[in-house]
Curated annotation (Swiss-Prot):
Tissue expression pattern: Highly expressed in human placenta and also in B-cell and monocyte cell lines. Low expression in heart, brain, lung, skeletal muscle, kidney and pancreas.
PROSITE patterns for this protein: BZIP, BZIP_BASIC
GO MF term list: DNA-binding transcription factor activity; DNA-binding transcription factor activity, RNA polymerase II-specific; DNA-binding transcription repressor activity, RNA polymerase II-specific; RNA polymerase II cis-regulatory region sequence-specific DNA binding
Keywords linked to the UniProt accession: Activator, DNA-binding, Nucleus, Transcription, Transcription regulation
Family under the similarity heading: Belongs to the bZIP family. CNC subfamily.
Organism: Homo sapiens (Human)
GO CC, one annotated term: RNA polymerase II transcription regulator complex
Protein's recorded name: Nuclear factor erythroid 2-related factor 3
Entry keyword annotation includes NAD: no
Gene: NFE2L3
Phylogenetic lineage: Eukaryota, Metazoa, Chordata, Craniata, Vertebrata
Domain bZIP: from-to ranges: 578-641
Length: 694
């Protein structure tokens, strides 16, 4: 037995035997129950290998280290093997597991972690101390229970050290040999869950009470500090008040000022002059809900925010003054600035001495802090009034000179039309040029436009539709003294004056028409000269000689009418010769036109002629094919007749005549002779030669 035991402990023979049996597909259960190790080592091996539920290691008589006396090689603080121990036992377990399905057991531990507020650190330390004391007492009890279980033969000493919260359960449990091993994990998890829920309830209640106390204290401090600051600002001059606000803004950015409220912000903005509002950026505007993390948003701030938006908000300035770098400071600043409304008081319409009407902010601040954290700029801009966009349009025009809000409001009230012309709009002062000057010729044109009136032709005066020419009363000339007026209205040259829909009852323009200069005669003469340029050479000559007939009449008259016309009027020889030349050239021109017309007609009809010829050609081809077919039929019939005749003919000896050697020849008297083909061929050759000679 000792030899066998030493052989097994060496791990040689038993390893070879088990390997061979596992490869052969047999599972042999060796009767080694008489050689069981002490129960402590057996239970320790069962726990290390997965518990008693593992069927692969249920019959192992060896310890985890591979021998009987090697239980001391285990690490004292863990289940892992000692690195100095030999790996024979591990190899034995791996070989023994061959051919056996292994299902791993996965254990998941869930831990509920909750944050403790900064102000309740003392209470949290007290709770942690109590928990530590209870865990210490439980650990001692569990150790005692574990030792009793080991003495009983089957307890797990490490199951008692699984957690400090299992102490009560271990003390109440009886000292069974191995019955408590599978249930230790379940009982411990249940007790851990119950105790954690109790601790969470206590922590939540204490945190809630402490938060309420801190909020009330911070509210009182902020109100007192705001009152002091307001009193100081009211007593100091404007420049000292600006310094105070700047220092407060810097203190807010550095995190030292935690009692800045929205009501104080609006009062400071309303107390500052107009010019100082332009330098305030939205990055310096805080909200009460984003100043301190522990501050509850259920504080009672009352300001009517909708009225402030609809009256004194300039969205355009708010967007332009918002810096980009204010959103890159730190995560807390980013979350706080995302809650800031992109709004600012309008510096053009705000009275510096006027305060905000109303003190109700319940419509803006929600009672829950989570709602304030989720509030974005889109939610704030959702309730904006339409008047904001009207103010934006007005402010875009206010930068220009000679701005009149009443006229601009009337301009925005005009309805638009689909054609792009305001046909229903009323005549207002913002129109650039009145109806009397809508067709004016200005000395100051656009860049690259020729301003010399003498270089412009009559085509420049044509109207937009149908070549309309304006009346002389509608034409005016702007003197050089009005250049200042045009300098003020330079930006208005883009607009058009569509006032031709005015009713007769509409008042006439107060502006008097400019005096008509002497250049109108030049324009008219230039127009006449241009029309003369369009005349032909004959018309110009007839006009120069004062011939009382038009060129068309001279050319188109019949011969009798032309001669009578020349006899009725007293004309000089030069006029008569010119008239005859004009008539001759006109007739030649008409003849040439007729010739060209005939040629064009021929060219146009040539295609039809070609088509007709092609059709005729196809008809002739069809007729030729039919004639050839008829000729071939006649030849075939003649050939058949030859064979029939020669089949009936006989020579002197009574033999049939060969049609290949003889041929039939008709004479002039109608008789038929049988002639050899050689003679017929020679006779044809002689005839052909005679024909060639001729």
């Amino acid at each position: 037995m000792k030899h066998l035991k030493r052989w097994w402990s060496a791990g040689g023979g038993l390893l070879h035997l088990t390997l061979l049996l596992s490869l052969a597909g047999l599972r042999v259960d060796l009767d080694l129950y008489l050689l069981l190790p002490p129960p402590t080592l057996l239970q320790d091996e069962l726990l290390f290998l997965g518990g008693p539920a593992s069927s692969a290691y249920a019959l192992s008589p060896f310890s985890a280290s591979g021998g009987w006396g090697r239980a001391g090689h285990l690490h004292p603080k863990g289940r892992e093997l000692d690195p100095a121990a030999p790996p024979e036992g591990q190899l034995l377990r791996e070989v023994r597991a061959l051919g056996v399905p292994f299902v791993p057991r996965t254990s998941v531990d869930a831990w509920l972690v909750h944050s403790v507020a900064a102000g309740s650190a003392d209470e949290a330390h007290g709770l942690l101390g109590a928990a530590a004391a209870s865990s210490t007492g439980g650990a001692g009890a569990s150790v005692d229970g574990g030792s009793q279980a080991v003495q009983g033969g089957g307890g797990d000493p490490r199951a008692a050290r699984s957690g400090p919260l299992d102490a009560g359960e271990e003390e109440k449990a009886p000292a069974e040999p191995t019955a408590q091993v599978p249930d230790a994990g379940g009982c411990a998890s249940e007790e851990n869950g119950v105790l954690r829920e109790k601790h969470e309830a206590v922590d939540h209640s204490s945190q809630h009470e402490e938060n309420e106390e801190r909020v009330s204290a911070q509210k009182e401090n902020s109100l007192q500090q705001n009152d002091d600051d307001e009193n100081k600002i009211a007593e100091k001059p404007d420049w000292e008040a600006e310094k105070t606000t700047e220092s407060r803004n810097e203190r807010h950015l550095n995190g030292t000022d935690t009692s800045f409220s929205l009501e104080d912000l609006f009062q400071l903005l309303s107390s500052q002059p107009e010019n100082s509002l332009e330098g305030i950026s939205l990055g310096d505007i805080p909200l009460p809900g984003s100043i301190s993390d522990g501050m509850n948003s259920s504080a009672h701030y009352h300001v009517n925010f909708s009225q402030a938006i609809s009256q004194d908000v300039n969205l355009h300035e708010a967007i332009l003054l918002c810096p980009n770098n204010t959103f890159r400071r730190d995560p807390t600043a980013r979350t706080s600035q995302s809650q800031e409304p992109f709004l600012q008081l309008n510096s053009h319409t705000t009275n510096p001495e006027q305060t905000l009407p109303g003190t109700n902010l319940t419509g803006f601040l929600s009672p829950v802090d989570n709602h304030m954290r989720n509030l974005t700029s889109q939610d704030l801009l959702y309730d904006l009034d339409i008047n904001i966009f009207d103010e934006i349009n007005l402010m875009s025009l206010a930068t220009e000179d000679n701005f009149d809000p009443i006229d601009v409001s009337q301009l925005f009230d005009e309805p638009d039309s689909d054609s792009g012309l305001s046909l229903d709009s009323s005549h207002n002062n913002t129109s650039v040029i009145k109806s009397n000057s809508s067709h004016s010729v200005c000395d100051e044109g656009a860049i690259g436009y020729c301003t010399d009136h003498e270089s412009s032709s009559h085509h420049d005066l044509e109207g937009a539709v149908g070549g309309y020419y304006p009346e002389p009363s509608k034409l005016c000339h702007l003197d050089q003294s009005d250049s200042d007026f045009h300098g003020d209205l330079t930006f208005q040259h883009v607009f058009h004056n569509h006032t031709y829909h005015l009713q007769p009852t509409a008042p006439e323009s107060t502006s008097e028409p400019f005096p008509w200069p002497g250049k109108s005669q030049k324009i008219r003469s230039r127009y006449l000269e241009d029309t003369d340029r369009n005349l032909s050479r004959d018309e110009q000559r007839a006009k120069a000689l004062h011939i009382p007939f038009s060129v068309d009449e001279i050319v188109g008259m019949p011969v009798d009418s032309f001669n009578s016309m020349l006899s009725r009027y007293y004309l000089t020889d030069l006029q008569v010769s010119l008239i005859r030349d004009i008539r001759r050239r006109g007739k030649n021109k008409v003849a040439a036109q007729n010739c060209r017309k005939r040629k064009l007609d021929i060219i146009l009809n040539l295609e039809d002629d070609v088509c007709n010829l092609q059709a005729k050609k196809e008809t002739l081809k069809r007729e030729q094919a039919q004639c050839n077919k008829a000729i071939n039929i006649m030849k075939q019939k003649l050939h058949d007749l030859y064979h029939d005749i020669f089949s009936r003919l006989r020579d002197d000896q009574g033999r049939p005549v060969n049609p290949n050697h003889y041929a039939l020849q008709c004479t002039h008297d109608g008789s038929i002779l049988i002639v050899p083909k050689e003679l017929v061929a020679s006779g044809h050759k002689k005839e052909t030669q005679k024909g060639k000679r001729k």
